[in-house]
Amino acid sequence: MKPTYSTTTEKRIEIKDAFSPYELSKFESAIKLSRLSFYCPYPSRQINSIYFDDYSYRSLEDSIEGNSLRTKRRIRWYGMQKKKVDATLEVKKKQGIYSWKQLYKNKYKVNPNAKSWGGMIESKDEKYGPNTDLLNQLPRSIISYNRQYFCSFDGKVRITIDQNLQSFLQNIPFSTNLIRSKKHHNFMIIEVKVDSKDEHLVELVRQEIPFAPRRFSKYCESLIPQKDIYLF
C-alpha cells in the first residue's frame, strides 16, 4: 500500500485563458518556437476531479464574485480506468494572483463504477484522524478533461492545455452521476504557472504565447447553465 502523507505546495502564480479548439495548433507552434525551450515532461493524460462545496455554495459564490481569498476542495485521480484507483484530496487556496494547495496524497481510493457516494469514495488511512477539510461539504460536480504538459528547459515555467472537458452535475444526495454529462468542447484552457519568486517570467511568456489572461473556473463552468459561446 502506498503511504499516506500531507504536504503544502509553495505559492505560485497561475494565469489562464480560454480559446477555441481551432486555435490549438497556433498555441502549440508558439510553445515550440519559444526561446524558453519547452518540452513535454509527461505524456497527456485524463484528469478527473470531484468538487465539493457547502450547502450555500460558498466556493462557487467566492469564485464568481472574485473574492480575495478563495478555497476549493476536490478529490483528484488520473486516467480512464473503471476500477478502484488512488486519489488525492486537494484543498486549493487562491489569494489575488497567488495560489497554493494542501495535498493529502493517497488518502483516498475512488471507484468510478460505484452508484452511491458511500461506494465511490473510500478513506484508506485514518492516521490523521477525521479530515475536517470535508466537514459540511457535499460533492457538487465531477469534471474530466485531457491535459497536455509543457515545461521550460530550466523548469521555471509550466504550461498546460486542457481540452475535451465534460462535467457531471451531482444533485442527488446519495447517488453518483457519471452518465449524464455536459460537454464543454467549444473551448480549451491554457494555463501558465510560475513560482512566486519568478513572477518576472510571466511577462516574457505573454510576449511569446498569444493569450490574454482572464479569470476562469472549471467548477463554475460546470454548474452555470451552458451558453452557446464560441471563441472564434
Give the ranges of each region predicted by the language model.
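Phosphate-end processing signature that detects enzymes handling 5′-triphosphorylated RNA
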Residues: 1-232
